[in-house]
């Protein structure tokens, strides 16, 4: 799917690609590039786009470079699908002749948000670098929101873990903590990747001075978010250890109960087994009060250790 955007009085608006030419576009946004779209861009704009871009290559030399086809940046963008599966999807950015080309494999929240804002947002300088950096700013805002959401979820989990009384609450909390840790790592990877991309872009001599200041602002935002992201892992680790500790305490309590019960029933069992021995000479067997006395002896044998454990506060 191909979307093209042009400037009108420094306002970004989407054109009808079926009725308008792509010439003078400032942003060409493509989701799952087709051969037909590639040929049209080649014919109208003279830009050669590959239909088989290796978007997932994480080598810096392959993700950030400049050649005759323009300036190339491959950067991660965070997403969460309808089934709450999260991940980072790579977007390829190409800038040439003041046109920004974005090639991606899926719909991304940062792009949707930026398109909505662009309807009423005026570009200060009206160049492709500004659109690129605006997209990165939108991405950083989204990542900041994700960090805030994780903080909120951790606060809820903290209450559940510290006040929980049921084992299934701890099980669910551990599962959620693992998911939050995974989200945190993906956010961190996205932040670090963006930091590398902006550092690469800032070193280019042909980037306008105004966008250089904008890039520095993005780097400052990333530097402020990374420590917050790091503290999330510390919080997750603390809550995991706390949950595991409470689970161990509960398991030890159960084991303790079984141990005490087995000790309490051991003396009565000894008494019962003594009178269950099959010998010819056992005077108590012919005694009329032998059976009730044996039962009473078993009760006292079990009651004595129980009272002792209660006195020691082991129960």
Swiss-Prot record:
The central ion permeation pathway is formed by the first transmembrane domain from each of the five subunits. Mg(2+) binding strengthens interactions between subunits and leads to the formation of a symmetrical homopentamer surrounding a closed ion permeation pathway. Low Mg(2+) concentrations trigger both a conformation change within each subunit and a loosening of the interactions between subunits. This results in an open ion conduction pathway. In addition, this results in a less symmetrical shape of the whole complex. GO terms for molecular function: cobalt ion transmembrane transporter activity; magnesium ion transmembrane transporter activity; nickel cation transmembrane transporter activity. A motif (Probable selectivity filter) lies at residues 276-278. The chain crosses the membrane at residues 257-277, 289-309. SUPFAM superfamilies: CorA soluble domain-like, Magnesium transport protein CorA, transmembrane region. Gene3D superfamilies: CorA soluble domain-like (3.30.460.20), Magnesium transport protein CorA, transmembrane region (1.20.58.340). One of its GO terms (cellular component) is plasma membrane. It comes from Wigglesworthia glossinidia brevipalpis. The lineage of its organism: Bacteria, Pseudomonadati, Pseudomonadota, Gammaproteobacteria, Enterobacterales. Mediates influx of magnesium ions. Alternates between open and closed states. Activated by low cytoplasmic Mg(2+) levels. Inactive when cytoplasmic Mg(2+) levels are high. InterPro entries: CorA_cytoplasmic_dom (IPR045861), CorA_MIT (IPR050829), CorA_TM1_TM2 (IPR045863), Mg/Co-transport_prot_CorA (IPR004488), MgTranspt_CorA/ZnTranspt_ZntB (IPR002523). This is Magnesium transport protein CorA. Its main location: membrane. NCBIfam families: corA. It comes from the Bacteria. Keywords: Cell inner membrane, Cell membrane, Ion transport, Magnesium, Membrane, Transmembrane, Transmembrane helix, Transport. The record marks 252 as: Essential for ion permeation. It is found in: Cell inner membrane. It catalyses: Mg(2+)(in) = Mg(2+)(out). It is a multi-pass membrane protein. Pfam families: CorA. Homopentamer. In the absence of Mg(2+), interactions between subunits are weakened, and dimers, trimers and tetramers can be observed in vitro. Belongs to the CorA metal ion transporter (MIT) (TC 1.A.35) family.
């Amino acid at each position: 799917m191909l979307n093209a955007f042009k400037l009108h009085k420094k306002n970004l608006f989407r054109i009808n690609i079926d009725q308008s030419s792509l010439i003078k576009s400032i942003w060409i946004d493509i989701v799952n590039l087709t051969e037909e779209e590639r040929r049209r861009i080649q014919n109208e704009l003279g830009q050669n786009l590959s239909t088989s871009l290796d978007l997932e290559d994480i080598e810096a030399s392959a993700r950030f470079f400049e050649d005759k086809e323009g300036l190339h940046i491959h950067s991660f963008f965070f997403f969460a699908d309808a089934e709450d599966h999260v991940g980072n999807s790579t977007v390829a950015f190409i800038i040439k002749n003041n046109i920004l080309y974005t090639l991606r494999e899926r719909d991304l929240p940062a792009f949707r948000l930026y398109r909505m804002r662009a309807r009423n947002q005026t570009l200060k300088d009206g160049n492709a670098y500004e659109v690129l950096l605006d997209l990165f700013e939108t991405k950083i805002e989204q990542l900041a929101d994700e960090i805030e959401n994780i903080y909120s979820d951790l606060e809820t989990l903290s209450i559940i873990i510290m006040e929980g009384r049921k084992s299934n609450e701890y099980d669910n909390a551990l599962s959620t903590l693992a998911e939050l840790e995974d989200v945190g790592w993906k956010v961190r990877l996205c932040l670090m990747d963006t930091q590398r991309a902006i550092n690469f872009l800032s070193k280019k001599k042909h980037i306008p001075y105004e966008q250089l200041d904008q890039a520095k602002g993005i780097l400052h935002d990333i530097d402020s978010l990374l420590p917050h992201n790091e503290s999330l892992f510390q919080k997750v680790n603390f809550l995991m250890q706390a949950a595991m500790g409470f689970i161990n305490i509960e398991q030890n309590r159960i084991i303790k109960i079984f141990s005490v019960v087995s000790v309490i029933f051991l003396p009565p069992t000894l008494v019962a087994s003594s009178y269950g021995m099959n010998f010819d000479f056992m005077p108590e067997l012919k005694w009329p009060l032998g059976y009730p006395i044996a039962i009473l002896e078993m009760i006292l044998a079990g009651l004595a250790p129980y009272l002792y454990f209660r006195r020691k506060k082991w129960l």
